[in-house]
């Protein structure tokens, strides 16, 4: 069996008058995230982790923010594309661990929905997907509620 590990990180600031979408789930909040796509910072970090595990660059290479085709793009579509690239090389998800770093909004009420969406998009067992959230104790840009940061680690395996 061959395994590959990928790490993804992404940050977006608050400020768009649109829904806040995280893991494909609408999370009630006063503002959305600034981005060329739909701004789903979680799915961007996961996509980067998958691409990194496969040595395929990053989402900026595959979906440049200078390309009008990706303006307002659904990040679930982007994630599924990245995962399809891994699957085409014979790899499948072993597990996924995500950390959402945000002072606000509270993520706990939405975590299970997020896991379900990820399991569906990655054709995986929800038991292989972990999503957790933490704050920075009011320190830094996330602590000042200026934006959200996300780290994702993915294990892909090929039999």
UniProtKB/Swiss-Prot annotation:
One protein family per Pfam: YgbB
Record: residues binding a divalent metal cation: 10, 12, 44
Keywords, ordered alphabetically: Isoprene biosynthesis, Lyase, Metal-binding
GO molecular function: 2-C-methyl-D-erythritol 2,4-cyclodiphosphate synthase activity; metal ion binding
Free-text cofactor note: Binds 1 divalent metal cation per subunit.
Requisite cofactors: a divalent metal cation
GO terms under biological process: isopentenyl diphosphate biosynthetic process, methylerythritol 4-phosphate pathway; terpenoid biosynthetic process
Enzyme class: lyase
Annotated catalysed reactions: 4-CDP-2-C-methyl-D-erythritol 2-phosphate = 2-C-methyl-D-erythritol 2,4-cyclic diphosphate + CMP
NCBIfam families registered for this protein in UniProt: ispF (TIGR00151)
Family statement: Belongs to the IspF family.
Name of this protein: 2-C-methyl-D-erythritol 2,4-cyclodiphosphate synthase
Organism of derivation: Shewanella oneidensis (strain ATCC 700550 / JCM 31522 / CIP 106686 / LMG 19005 / NCIMB 14063 / MR-1)
């Amino acid at each position: 069996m061959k395994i590959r590990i990928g790490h993804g990180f992404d940050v977006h600031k608050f400020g768009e008058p649109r829904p806040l979408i995280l893991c494909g789930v609408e999370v009630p909040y006063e503002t959305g995230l600034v981005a060329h796509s739909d701004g789903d910072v979680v799915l961007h970090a996961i996509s980067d982790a998958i691409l990194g595990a496969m040595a395929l660059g990053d989402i900026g290479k595959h979906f440049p923010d200078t390309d009008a085709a990706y303006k307002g793009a659904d990040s679930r579509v982007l994630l599924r594309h990245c995962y399809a690239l891994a699957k085409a090389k014979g790899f499948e998800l072993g597990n996924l661990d995500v950390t959402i770093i945000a002072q606000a909004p509270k993520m706990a009420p939405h975590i299970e929905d997020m896991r379900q969406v990820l399991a569906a998009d990655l054709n995986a067992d929800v038991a292989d997907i972990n999503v957790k959230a933490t704050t920075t104790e009011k320190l830094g840009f996330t602590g000042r509620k200026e934006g959200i940061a996300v780290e994702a680690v993915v294990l892909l395996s090929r039999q």
